[in-house]
A protein has these predicted regions:
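Acidic, PIN/NYN-like endoribonuclease modules and their adjacent C-terminal/linker elements
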Residues: 3-11, 30, 53-107
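Surface-exposed alpha-helical segments enriched in charged/polar residues
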Residues: 34-37, 89
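Acidic, metal-binding active-site segment of PIN/NYN-like and related structure-specific nucleases
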Residues: 29, 36-58
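Active-site-proximal, substrate-binding regions of enzyme catalytic domains
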Residues: 1-27
Length: 107
């Protein structure tokens, strides 16, 4: 996910960070979910479908955590942020504890 999304999320009042900023770039699947949970995160956003599906398997052990697959098409950072903002304005991003959800729905 483009790092520029962090600025938008913070602007929207969402506490967020990028895995790379935390030194988690090498973590995969359940290990990344565990690291996120251990530092107080309740949700992970990803554009990678295979990663999201794999990480969601860890949800059986962490039923209060959610994985959200962002299905906005791959474009450059600034354009992605524009599309993310537009989607946010028309559709709530609602993580569901213990689940993998796709957002925005219908994409």
């Amino acid at each position: 996910m483009p790092r520029q999304v962090l600025g938008l999320l913070k602007e929207l009042g969402v506490s967020a960070d990028h895995a790379e900023n935390r030194g988690w770039g090498g973590l995969v699947n359940g290990s990344l979910v565990e690291a996120a949970i251990s530092t107080g995160f309740v949700c992970l956003l990803s554009r990678d479908r295979l990663f999201s599906e794999s990480a969601s398997r860890a949800l059986k052990r962490f039923p209060d955590f959610s994985v959200v697959l962002i299905v906005i098409p791959q474009v450059r950072g600034a354009e992605f942020v524009t599309r993310f903002r537009a989607a946010w304005q028309t559709q709530d991003l609602r993580p569901v504890p213990g689940s993998l959800v796709s957002w925005p729905a219908g994409k």
